[in-house]
Swiss-Prot record:
Plays a central role in 2-thiolation of mcm(5)S(2)U at tRNA wobble positions of tRNA(Lys), tRNA(Glu) and tRNA(Gln). Directly binds tRNAs and probably acts by catalyzing adenylation of tRNAs, an intermediate required for 2-thiolation. It is unclear whether it acts as a sulfurtransferase that transfers sulfur from thiocarboxylated URM1 onto the uridine of tRNAs at wobble position. This is Cytoplasmic tRNA 2-thiolation protein 1. One of its GO terms (biological process) is tRNA thio-modification. InterPro entries: CTU1-like_ATP-bd, CTU1_C, Ncs6/Tuc1/Ctu1, Rossmann-like_a/b/a_fold, TilS/TtcA_N, tRNA_thiolation_TtcA_Ctu1, UPF0021_CS. Keywords: Cytoplasm, RNA-binding, Transferase, tRNA processing, tRNA-binding. GO terms for cellular component: cytosol; cytosolic tRNA wobble base thiouridylase complex; mitochondrion. It comes from the Eukaryota. Belongs to the TtcA family. CTU1/NCS6/ATPBD3 subfamily. Pathway: tRNA modification; 5-methoxycarbonylmethyl-2-thiouridine-tRNA biosynthesis. Its main location: cytoplasm. It is found in: Cytoplasm.
Length: 343
C-alpha cells in the first residue's frame, strides 16, 4: 500500500527525507529543500540587494545544486543579485579536466558568466606536478591552501561582493570532528561560521547549504535531473578528512541526527579568553589575506620552486632551518666555484 505524502498534498510519497524522516512526494521535497535554503539565506542575511556573488563551481553535486538553487531563489524571491560562476582548475588529469566540462554545461544551463583560473597560470604548477614532487601524503595541504587563495584571486578579478561555496552540513560536521581530534581550537571556533572573512582586504565567503544534508543534495540533483560530475578526486582517498567522514557515517547509522547535533554543538562552544584567534592581515609577498608572514601559499610555493617541497609542511621553525641549510649549501658551492675559477 503506497504511503501518502506527509505534506498532505494528496500525492503518494516518493522518498523519505534523511534529515527529518518525513515521507514526501518529489514536489513537496523540492519545496521543503528550497525553502530551508531560502530561510538560511534570509535569516543569516547572507546577501544584500545589488550585490555580485561568485558561486564557487567545481561541477560536483554540491556546487551544481548551489548554482541551480541560487538562480531559482534569486528569481523567485527577487534577491536582486548578480550571479557568476568561478571555477578553479587544479591541473588533475582525469578529474578536473573532465569536471570543467560539467561546469561549462552549468554555465550554459543557468545562463551565468563563468571564470576559470588555473594553478598553472597563478602559481606555475599543476597538482599533477606537485604530487610528482611530494608524493600523496601531503597533497591535500597544497591543494587546499592554493585553492583557497585562488578563489580569493578570482573573486578579486571579478570584483564580487562575496563567494558562495557548496559546503554542506556533512562537510561542516566533518570539519568540527577533525578540529576536535587535532585539538585545533583556533579553527574549531570558526569552522561552523556561515560567513567567514570580510573586511578591507578580504572577500567574505558564505555557505547557503550549511544545514543541507549531503544525501538530500544528491536526492535533489537526482530527481531534478541536474548535470553534475560524480567522480572523486584521484588524490582524495589519502586525505585525513576521509577518516572523519567514515567515522561520521558510522555514527549516523546509530543516530541519524548526529550531523546536525555536531554542528549545533560546534556553534555553542565557548572558549577561554586565552584561546585567541590568529590576527589576520595581508601577506607581505602576494598581498592576499593571511594570519602569518609570509602566507602559507607563498611558503609552499617557495618550497616547490626551491626544490624543497616539504618546506611548508609542519612548523615554521623547521622550514626556516631547511631554507638556512639550502642557502648555506648554495653559498659553499658558489665559493667552491670561485676558488676553482681562480686557478
Amino acid at each position: 500500500m503506497p504511503i501518502n505524502c506527509k505534506a498532505k498534498c494528496g500525492k503518494a510519497a516518493a522518498l523519505k527525507r534523511p534529515k527529518t524522516g518525513d515521507a514526501l512526494c518529489k514536489e513537496c521535497f523540492f519545496a521543503a529543500f528550497e525553502a530551508e535554503i531560502h530561510h538560511t539565506i534570509t535569516s543569516s542575511k547572507l546577501f544584500r540587494r545589488g550585490e555580485k556573488v561568485a558561486v564557487a563551481a567545481s561541477g560536483g553535486k554540491d556546487s551544481t545544486v548551489l548554482a541551480h538553487v541560487m538562480k531559482l531563489l534569486n528569481e523567485r524571491h527577487d534577491y536582486g543579485l548578480e550571479l557568476v560562476l568561478l571555477s578553479i582548475d587544479e591541473g588533475i588529469t582525469g578529474y578536473r579536466d573532465d569536471s570543467l566540462e560539467t561546469v561549462k554545461q552549468n554555465r550554459d544551463d543557468y545562463k551565468m558568466p563563468l571564470k576559470i583560473l588555473s594553478y598553472e597560470e597563478l602559481y606555475g604548477w599543476t597538482m599533477d606536478r606537485i604530487v610528482s614532487q611530494i608524493g600523496r601524503s601531503n597533497n591535500c595541504t597544497f591543494c587546499g591552501v592554493f585553492r583557497r587563495q585562488a578563489l580569493d584571486r578570482g573573486a578579486k578579478l571579478l570584483c564580487v561582493d562575496s563567494i558562495a561555496t557548496g559546503h554542506n552540513a556533512d562537510d561542516i560536521a566533518e570539519t568540527v570532528l577533525m578540529n576536535v581530534l587535532r585539538g585545533d581550537t583556533a579553527r574549531l571556533r570558526r569552522c561552523t561560521d556561515i560567513r567567514t572573512g570580510g573586511g578591507e582586504d578580504s572577500i567574505p565567503r558564505v555557505k547557503p547549504l550549511k544545514y543541507s544534508y549531503e544525501k538530500e543534495i544528491v536526492m535533489y540533483a537526482h530527481y531534478k535531473k541536474l548535470v553534475y560530475f560524480s567522480t572523486e578526486c584521484v588524490f582524495a582517498p589519502n586525505a585525513y578528512r576521509g577518516h572523519a567522514r567514515a567515522f561520521l557515517k558510522d555514527l549516523e547509522k546509530v543516530r541519524p541526527s548526529v550531523i546536525m547535533d555536531i554542528i549545533y554543538s560546534g556553534e555553542q562552544l565557548r572558549f577561554k579568553d586565552t584561546a585567541k584567534n590568529p590576527v589576520r592581515g595581508t601577506c607581505n609577498r602576494c598581498g592576499f589575506i593571511s594570519s602569518q608572514q609570509p602566507c602559507k601559499a607563498c611558503v609552499l610555493l617557495e618550497g616547490l620552486n626551491r626544490g624543497l617541497p616539504k618546506l611548508g609542511i609542519g612548523k615554521k621553525s623547521k622550514g626556516d632551518r631547511m631554507i638556512a641549510k639550502q642557502d648555506q649549501e648554495l653559498a659553499l658551492r658558489e665559493r667552491a666555484n670561485l676558488v676553482k675559477n681562480d686557478f
